[in-house]
Regions:
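Short beta-strand-to-loop capping motifs
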Residues: 71, 91, 140-144
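Hydrophobic residues embedded in beta-strands of well-ordered beta-sheets
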Residues: 66-68, 85-87, 134-136
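Ampiphathic alpha-helical segments that act as solvent-exposed interaction surfaces
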Residues: 106-120, 141-172
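Ordered, soluble secondary-structure elements with a strong preference for glycine-centered loop motifs
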Residues: 43, 99-102, 148-153
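A short acidic-to-branched-hydrophobic micro-motif
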Residues: 78-98
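Charge-rich, low-complexity N-terminal segments
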Residues: 4-81
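Short, internal acidic amphipathic alpha-helical interface segments
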Residues: 91-139
Length: 172
């Protein structure tokens, strides 16, 4: 009977030690996470966008409610409000197709449809009758809040995805 009690005590002790070690590791993880900056908690999406774009060294121009900026030599536009956590990024007019060339128009439409199946962004085309052309553009609606970890890297990765979209479109 004594050996069985000894084994049970040994197992209980091992379990207790493992639990204490797990608690200690969890406490270390929690303590290593920097507390959120209270001054950023009240910042709205639009203001956060502007702050992050400046941190990314983007040339920023505000026109009415829209934010125009250059990121890696590409022109973008953001629609954002401090009243909503969502914003829309537009990559405007990055390709053009002559509307009189039927074959190019058909290829463009197929490429737009196929690209929309493969990427996160939405690829669109707009017809300009006076110029007799179609312009290709893309957009992405996403969430941006101060408590997303590393918001600068998040926005940068989101913008980088537009380059992937163009690459995908050109390869279709």
């Amino acid at each position: 009977m004594l050996p069985i009690i000894s084994v049970l005590i040994g197992i209980s002790l091992m379990y207790y030690i493992r639990q204490k070690r797990a608690e200690k590791e969890m406490d270390e993880i929690v303590n290593s996470i920097s507390p959120s900056n209270d001054s950023n908690e009240n910042i709205g999406t639009r203001d956060l966008c502007l702050e992050l774009l400046r941190q990314l060294n983007c040339e920023v121009r505000i026109e009415h409610d829209d934010i125009y900026f250059t990121y890696q030599n590409e022109k973008f536009m953001i629609e954002a409000s401090n009243d909503s956590a969502f914003f829309t990024i537009w990559d405007l007019h990055w390709d053009m197709v002559d509307s009189e060339n039927i074959q190019d128009v058909e290829n463009m439409k197929k490429a737009v449809n196929r690209t929309n199946q493969l990427v996160h962004n939405t690829v669109l085309y707009m017809s300009y009758e006076e110029e007799k052309s179609y312009y290709i553009l893309s957009k992405l609606q996403c969430l941006l809040m101060h408590n997303i970890p590393n918001t600068k890297a998040y926005l940068s990765a989101t913008l980088d995805d537009f380059f992937r979209t163009k690459q995908c479109y050109s390869q279709v």
